[in-house]
Amino acid sequence: EDGVSYETYHFPYEQLDRAISAGAPTGQIKVHAKSLTGKILGASVLGERAGELITAFTIAMRNGVTLRNIGDTIHPYPAYGEGVRRVADQWYVQKQSPTFTKVLQTVFGYRGPVLKYGPDEIV
């Protein structure tokens, strides 16, 4: 879509426990989504079980499922499909407001460090 603000999120197979245990940690999942809403605009998967994983994104795009919806869904572990949720988590975590984080710190009395998430960070 022309003029649409979007971000790209990725999750490497080398951090996907199922891929590691199968001896196939080479590959990645990449998703392009609207910055504000998490609406999926496109996705690509390179690696083991790519054909199975891309289906999740195809269904999501066709039915208006957002990265937030995927991130809120429990996925089996260890499974390649967990990579779908982990890439969705990239969007979810980056949308947490610093103000909300500070409120939580105050309410729960947390004084330790708070991780800073950016487009190149993997959660």
Task: Give, region by region, the residue ranges found by the protein language model.
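Flexible, glycine-rich terminal cap/loop adjacent to redox cofactors
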Residues: 1-123
